[in-house]
Every structure is written in C-alpha cells, then in structure tokens.
Curated annotation (Swiss-Prot):
Region spans: Disordered: 1-45, 166-195
Protein name: Non-structural maintenance of chromosome element 4
Major place of residence: nucleus
Record flagged with keyword DNA damage: yes
Function: Acts in a DNA repair pathway for removal of UV-induced DNA damage that is distinct from classical nucleotide excision repair and in repair of ionizing radiation damage. Functions in homologous recombination repair of DNA double strand breaks and in recovery of stalled replication forks.
Family the UniProt entry places it in: Belongs to the NSE4 family.
Pfam families: Nse4-Nse3_bdg, Nse4_C
Subcellular location: Nucleus
One of the protein's GO biological processes: chromatin looping
Basic and acidic residues bias locations: 22-43, 179-191
Keyword Transmembrane helix part of the UniProt annotation: no
PANTHER family, per database record: NON-STRUCTURAL MAINTENANCE OF CHROMOSOMES ELEMENT 4
Cellular component GO terms held in the UniProt record: chromosome, telomeric region; nucleus; Smc5-Smc6 complex
Amino acid sequence: MSSTVISRKRRNSTVTEPDSSGETRKQKKSRSDEKSSSSKDGDPQLEFKVLQGYRDLESEMHKGRAQVTRTGDIGVAMDNLNAVDSLFNKVIGIKNNGLFAHDARAMVSISELAQISVRNLKFDDSRSMVNLENIVNSLKRYMLKEHFKLNNIAENRNDLTLAADEQSAADQQEESDGDIDRTPDDNHTDKATSSFKATSMRHSYLQQFSHYNEFSQFNWFRIGALYNTISKNAPITDHLMGPLSIEKKPRVLTQRRRNNDQVGEKITAEKITQHSLNSTQQETTPEQVKKCFKKLSKKLGPEGSINLFKFIIDPNSFSRSIENLFYTSFLIKEGKLLMEHDEEGLPTIKIKQSISHTDSRSKEIERQRRRAAHQNHIIFQMDMPTWRKLIKKYNITSPFLD
C-alpha cells in the first residue's frame, strides 16, 4: 500500500495550479506584478470573500470527517486540498496574517483527514484498494523463485497476461484514432475499465502461488534481505548496552592464613672440587665400559655369544638400558666386541678374538684382513614402547649387566 502524502510549496515567485486538460501551468510574477499586487492590500471585499471561503471549507471538512471515518475515501481530503489551493491563489500578495492563519488551520485539518483515511482503509472491500490475497501471493512468488529453479517448475503465464498486453495495445490504438469524437467522461470510463481488467488478470495470475504453504519451500533470507534494503527502520544499539541492573557485590573480608609449615633443616650445596669431578668422570665413562666388558667375558667366555637386546636391556630401568647400549657401542667401535646376525637375522654380540699367530708376518696379514673386512654402521633407536615390547618378547626378568 502506498501512503498518501499531502504537501504543497508556496513561493512568492511562482504559482502552480491544475488546468482543465490536466497539465500544470506556471505563472511567473515579475517586479511589475509585485507592484500591482500591493493594490490588493486595501481590498476589504476580497479579503472578506476569501475569509468566508475558508470558514465554509472548515465546515465542509467537519462534515467530511464522518464520511472519511466510515469509508476511508482519500478523495475527500484531495478535494479539500484543491479548494484550499484555489483560495490561497486569490490572496497572493495580500499582507493579512489572519488569512494565513486560516490557511494553516485548513492545511492541518486536511492532513488529519488524510491520516484518518489511510488508517481506515478497508482492504478487499473495494477493487481500487490493494487486495490482501494478492499481496500474500506476490510475496510467495518472490520467495518461490529458487524453489521453482531447483525443481524445474515453470510459472503458468497463461493467456490472460498476453491478452492484457494485446488489449492495452488495442485500447491505445482506439484512443489515438478516436480522440476527436471522445469526450473526457468516455476517456475516464475506458481507463477505469482497463484498470479493472488488469487487476482481475493479475489476481488470476497470482492464484497459482496460493497453494504453496510449506515453510521449507520459501527463501526467507531473500525477503529478509529485501526488507533490510528498503525499510526505514532506525539502527538499534542494543548489543552495545550492558546489563541495566548491576548489583554491587558485597566485599568479603578474608583473614590471611598463617603459614604454620615447619622449617626444615638448613642444607648447603656440596662444594665441587677438581678431584670430585675427575672421580665422577671416571665412574661414568671409561670405568663403566670396562666393567661392562669384564662382566661379558666372565659370563660368556671367549667363545660365547648373546643376543644384543638380552645383553643391554634392564627390565627395571629404561635409562639404564640406554646407558648399556651406549657402552656397547663404544666396545664395538674399539674392536673389543663383534656384532653378527643369528639364524633369525637378529643382532648378536661376542668377544672379538685377538690375533693368535706368533709369526710377525702372519699377524700383520691377519691385521690387514680385519681392516679390509666389510663394516656396517647402524643407528639404533629405542623408545619406551619398544623397550617394553623387547622385554615381553625375550621374557627378560633380570638385567644381564647387574
């Protein structure tokens, strides 16, 4: 529904008024007209006549208020507006504030009539009004475009729409051919008839969307975006406002707890000397390697061999197992131990035999043969899960290097 807005602009330079043909005519006033208009200031008969016209118009508007309230006819307000404009055109140039006060009061009354008319519009009772059913079906058509596109549904643009276009073209042709013979009343009747036909055809066209009532068929985001684009709602700032009622939390006085922990015995750090550093270093590297070799020689003998994992793994300490692997790598590097593969391809270690030849030439040949022998470098990595799996696989219950 389009709202009716009543407004008019009055200037001393120009005056716009409708003529019988519907066209607007502008009357420009020159300086000579302004001089001649000063003669109206002293015309009491004209002022009295215009004043009487304003009073009669106010009486008519008072009577028309009941009609507007009952029918919602906006034409009453428009007729009164035209009457006020004609009265105002008669007093242009007259300096009489009393007449201007009556004119302003009349404009206020006309605005109230227009407001009452818009408020009391009764839809569906008159074909000149907007039909509520057509509004709903038009909204459905707007929101069903995506549904029609996804389901390959075509709008039923029946012959009524085409007939309306043809009828409109024919009416225009007849109007151009018979303008000489037609009267203004006939033209007005033809326009009303064409408008009635167009309204009926549009109503029939929109009926095809009336049976769509499922919520999921409509694109509600589309109508929301349209409303957000063309609506005049003021932006709100509710999201910037905090809670309106903030209760002040009462302050709770707490008593600090005394520390009753007993003070332990005072301990000072041990002083580090050069002798203690040397002794610690001897225990952690070379001595541990020597102890590891002595235990292997004592338990296996010169000819025995043992699985590498059974030799290094300590089932009670993961860190100790890593240390044993570290010591074993030193023994292999220095040529004290020899690592081989058993029948299953698992690594085994044994004590490397010394050269037993008495002849110096034979010793040198054996030494060169051992140097030329193929050597493999292995990077062995052991983590906690692997360590547990090896203990379970070989059923290791006690460390070999205890």
